[in-house]
Structure formats: structure tokens, C-alpha cells
Amino acid sequence: MLGYGREGKAMVKALETFAPRAKITIADKNESIEKHPMYPMQIGSGWLDNLQNFDVIIASPGIPPQELPMDAAIQEKITNSTQVFLDTIADRGAVSIGVTGSKGKSTTASLIAAIVKNAGKDVLLLGNIGEPAIAHLDDIKKDTHIVLEMSSYQLMHTKTSPTIAIITSFFPEHLDYHGSLESYQAAKANIARFQPKGTAIFYNKLFPEAKVIAKMSQGKKVAFTWEDAPLRIEETHLLGMHNLSNMAAASKVSLFLKVPKPVILNALREFKGLPHRLQSLGVHHGIEWVDDAISTTPESTIAALEALGDRVFTIILGGQDRGNDFSELAKKIHASKVEHVILFPGSGSRIRDALEQTENRIKLYEAASMDEAVNLAKDLTTKTKICLLSTASPSYNMFKNFEEKGEEFLKCIQR
């Protein structure tokens, strides 16, 4: 077991139950990792030693591919918990519904799960959105519908595709992890690459890369766009035109599963949205605060600005620099009613450069912490207007994940 974090621990527990005779070794480069009382461990600088001696190597999704040995014999042995999970549930006859995409996968997966549940079916929402899927093998019966949010990390070493696959969108992302756009696309493609006949893939045809990936499937291919959404945004609790695409995907998949249309529409109307995704935190200090901590690319922050319109007065941007192009975001900000931009370290300096290459109407500020950013926003934002947290960058240089970033945002607002 390579990597002994949350997913690695869940995988080891699953092996104890479903492969009790397996001889397990745990490997992790973190020398301070929690020790297992039963199994040998390879930690620190020697964590990748003697991999050729193992029959199966299960890699945790957080391990960048370039850290693993490139030896062909070793690469052939590498798999992941996603592969093990999909193979196991296929043997039980359960329906797997995998959702991937640079953006929109969490909301789309949650919408599908809500609709299927509304139809009275047994459903589990697992994967990148919550608990490791492998931890729920005991919960799966023949008639269970498993909705999996699948990141490129989780698809990386997978050689089994879900029964139903969905590609919501495609933007350059996680390039520091994958090493290149080609590797990122190849990982995403595993959601379709191993689909046999009798399966189906749904893809957003506005993204050429999604269509290329869909062609790899031997299953039924179904295209969708935002125009296929069965409701207007105003008829739901969702914000932003991009959610039309998410509703379109969810409704098309649900119809394929023979869910009646009235059931689909009812579930879409009742769906309340997800935390940290254009989530209004209410009015504090006379200002409306919107948490869009999930947005870690320029494209998703542009979508957030489009969703909220002219009420955004202050925006908090920046974080870990993944080399993204911020020129289109700069144009969008200059074309909006945004007056103040607060920049975090890292990509903040390149966002500043992009903004300063055009007109200099907008006032720029720097903040070294969330507390400093929120205090600035309290002073700068006009009453009744919006302060938006949508950083257009990941924030691993400051926070554990986007959830922690959003939670810290709320804490600072409430002080």
C-alpha cells in the first residue's frame, strides 16, 4: 500500500476483510506517519524500495505519478483503490455511475444521487466528494446505485471504467501533479477507455476534449449542453448559468436510468446546492459574503462572476501557483463592477500582472492570511454589495484543502 493517508487506511481495512490472506506492506515517504501495529512499513527515503518483490502495488491518489518508479515491470503492477472498488462491485452486479470533469463533477454527482434517491432507489454518493469508496464495500447490494465523483488522481491508474460515465467539462488543471496536459487528459480518459458494450457515456459536447474521450468508449454515447437543462436556474436553488450544464447531465443520466421526468424535476427544484460552491453566507457588517472556495481555476472564477453579476464589489484571489493563464480572468474583472481585488501570496503576483496589463481602474491589495483579507474586505466593500471568495487557484500553500479555506473565511467574517 503506497501512501497511508485517509484512502490508504481505508484500503488496508478493506484488504483485511476481503483479502484476509494477503501479506500487506505499507509504504509512505512521511516518516511521522501513524505506524500500523500489524504490518511492516517502509517509510522515509526508502519507501519505494523493493517494489519489484510485490505482486500488487496499490497507490494512493495523492501520490504524483512522477514520484513512482518508471520501470515497466513495476508500472504494470500499480493499481489503486478505485480499480479494486469498481472490480468488486461489478462482480456484485451493482450499477456504478462515475462523474468526472475539471469543474461541475461534485454538483452533477450530487444531483444524480438526489434524483435517484427521490426515485426510491438505493443510492450511495462516494469518491472524491466524501468518504473513500473502498470503505463502503459492505454497504453495496445488487440493486445499489453507486454515484462516484472521480478526480483525475483517482482515475490515474484505473483499468476499469464505470457502467455509466459522465464528463462535465475539461479545462487544464492539476498540471503540477500530472506533469503535462496530455497526462491529465489521459487520466481523465480512463473513465471511458475501458467501457465495454452495454455501458454508456454522457459528455458535454462544448468541450472538444470530452468528445475525444467519449469516443474511446464502446458504450452508448450521449452528448449534452446547458441547453438540455429541463429547468431554468430561477426555478432552482442553484446560482450561475454553469449549473444548467450540471442539471442537463444529471437529467439525461436519470432518464437513461428510467427515472420518470416528474421525479427528476422535483429533485432538481428541491436540491439546495453544496457548501463552498457559490454559497451565500448571508449579510454580515452590511455586506453579503459568498463562499466559492471550490473555484481553483480562472475558468471557474469567471463562471462565479458571471453568476453573481454586477453586485460583486470585492473579490479575493490567489493561492498556489500552478502556472494558469489569468488573462481572461483579468478581462472579466475589468468588464465587471468589481472595484477591489485582494490577492493572496503565490499566484497573486501573476494575477496582479495580468490585471495591470489592461486599464488600471481596479484597486489591488495584498493579504498574507484569510483574517487580513476579510478585514480588508470589511473596510473596502460597499454596504449591500458582495465580497466573493473565489481564488482562481488552489490554496495548498495556505490551507489543507478548499473546505478548510471556506470554513476559515466564515470564521473570519463572524469575528
What are the language-model segments listed below?
Residues E16-T17, L48-F54, P61-A200, K205, ...:
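Phosphate-binding loop of NTP-binding sites
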Residues E31-H36, D49-N50, I63-P69, F207-V212, ...:
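Short, charged/polar "capping" segments at the starts of alpha-helices
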Residues M1-M11, T25-I33, L274, A293-I362, ...:
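Active-site beta-alpha connecting loops in nucleotide-dependent enzymes
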Residues H36-G46, A73-T79, A94, K215-I233, ...:
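Active-site regions of enzymes building and remodeling cell-envelope glycoconjugates
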Residues A22-I24, N53-V56, D122-V123, P196-I201, ...:
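Short active-site oxyanion
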Residues M11-A14, F18, D122-V123, T236-V338:
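Nucleotide phosphate-binding/pyrophosphate-handling subdomain across enzymes
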Residues K23-D28, L124-L125, V147, A223, ...:
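Short beta-strand "acidic-cap" motif of Rossmann-like dinucleotide-binding folds
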Residues M1-N80, V84, L239:
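N-terminal leader/targeting and accessory segments in enzymes
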